[in-house]
A protein has these predicted regions:
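Transmembrane beta-barrel architecture of outer-membrane proteins
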Residues: 52-54, 100, 145, 259-261, ...
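A glycine-biased, small/acidic residue-tolerant capping/turn segment at secondary-structure junctions
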Residues: 327-351, 376-391
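Regular, well-ordered alpha-helical segments
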Residues: 20, 27, 85, 92, ...
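Periplasmic alpha-helical coiled-coil/stalk elements that build and connect Gram-negative outer-membrane
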Residues: 69, 78, 85-200, 311, ...
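Sec/SRP-type N-terminal targeting helices
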Residues: 9-10, 26-27, 63-91, 141, ...
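Bacterial Sec-pathway N-terminal export signals of envelope proteins
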Residues: 1-21, 137-139, 189-219, 269-270, ...
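Small/polar, glycine/serine/threonine/aspartate-rich low-complexity segments that form flexible
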Residues: 36-60, 181-197, 203, 226, ...
Length: 392
């Protein structure tokens, strides 16, 4: 389902670009061959034209004594793996975001049902308080207060319905689909692992795509420094030409003869030595920056995992307390309604009890969502699922 997501497809294209760059760097270690055939016809003073041709094949190979090309290949290899980890990071983020949006829909459905049920009950309460007013047992102020509370809950119902629609649209957009109804279960039907790790070993953190990306970024910076240092040393290139030609200086020979030549070239930077040394300093500084970024990524990873574990544990411990709170508030609502019927309390106490119950019920649902969300966050913080990749 996620393969249609534009962010994931963009990340895949970046992997393909890095793979092509790596292939180019590998080919630079091999000799290059060039075929440059030439031919022409010439005549002098209306004499018979003479045909000359030259069919040379030229080979050129840089002897990588100081590992300039090898370091360039290794740098591009690290960049290739870095692009793979970026794609994995996008994939893991998409999975986590999709799960969070799905659980958000389940939470909103539950809150919508609670608010809708409460609105129906409060509509009956408004009718009852109006009847009591007609019987001289309640005041107009009591009717107005109950009506205002009912309208407030009805407004919440409308807002929750809007939030459900917007969340469905967000999930459809994430999946690169047109807006439609999302089939889903209830919040209570969602199941998560009962036991979670307390204390996370470093080996688990190393599975995170951002940690691995930072590691490959550091490797790339290291080889970039080595590549810049190699530019201080001479480049040695061997070249040779073999081919057939019938042009031997000022003479034309037929049939053509085999022509062989070989040459060597040594290129030593002199006037660019200062610029090359500056590039080495820049590369070293960038390598140190990559090291610091790697260390900070490790620290951030540990913090995110611990935060997710703490949030999940807190939500699970709070669940029982919310259950007790809701049960107590239900009894409070029943008691105050009964007392009001016998004239022992006022409508304000009943109204307060109902509002407190509604608030607690919504918070109870939100706490269940927080528990589910923290498990998803933990999945993301630990790197998510891994894909098996092989460098081409």
């Amino acid at each position: 389902v996620l393969v249609r997501n534009t962010d994931l497809r963009t990340a895949q294209l970046q992997v393909e670009e890095a793979e092509a760059t790596l292939r180019t760097a590998r080919l630079s270690l091999l000799p290059s061959f060039t075929l440059a055939p030439q031919g022409g016809v010439s005549s002098f003073d209306n004499s018979k034209g003479t045909w000359t041709y030259n069919l040379p094949v030229t080979a050129s190979w840089e002897i990588d004594i100081f590992s300039r090309l090898r370091n360039g290949k290794l740098r591009n290899k690290a960049l290739y793996y870095q692009s793979i980890e970026y794609r994995q990071a996008v994939r893991t983020q998409l999975i986590a975001t999709t799960a969070n949006l799905y659980f958000t829909l389940c939470m909103l459905d539950e809150q919508y049902a609670i608010a809708n049920e409460t609105a129906s009950a409060w509509r009956e309460a408004v009718d009852a308080i109006r009847a009591m007013k007609d019987a001289g047992m309640a005041t107009e102020a009591a009717v107005a207060q109950n009506e205002a509370a009912y309208y407030s809950v009805e407004t919440s119902v409308k807002q929750l319905a809007q939030s459900i629609s917007e969340t469905e649209n967000s999930l459809c957009s994430l999946l690169a689909q047109t807006p439609h109804k999302i089939e889903r279960g209830s919040l209570e039907s969602q199941r998560m692992p009962a036991d979670l790790l307390i204390g996370v070993p470093v080996q688990l953190l190393s599975r995170r795509p951002d940690v691995r990306r930072a590691e490959y970024s550091l490797m790339s910076a290291y080889y970039a420094t080595a590549e810049a240092r190699s530019a201080l040393y001479p480049q040695i290139t061997l070249s040779g030409t073999a081919g057939w030609t019938n042009s031997a200086g000022s003479q034309i020979v037929n049939p053509g003869k085999l022509l062989l030549s070989a040459a060597g070239q040594l290129l030593q930077p002199i006037f660019q030595a200062g610029a090359n040394r500056a590039r080495v300093k820049i590369a070293k500084a960038q390598q140190q920056e990559a090291m610091l970024a790697y260390e900070q990524t490790i620290l951030n990873a540990g913090q995110e995992v611990n935060d997710a574990l703490t949030a999940c544990q807190t939500a699970r411990e709070s669940a029982a307390l919310y259950d007790q709170q809701v049960a107590s508030l239900r009894r409070a609502v029943e008691s105050t309604e009964l007392l009001m019927q016998h004239g022992s309390t006022t409508y304000l106490e009943v109204l307060t009890a109902r509002q407190s119950l509604l608030s607690a019920q919504l918070q109870q649902v939100a706490n269940r969502f927080t528990e589910l969300q923290s498990v998803v966050t933990l999945y993301h913080a630990l790197g998510g699922g891994r894909e098996t990749e092989t460098a081409q």
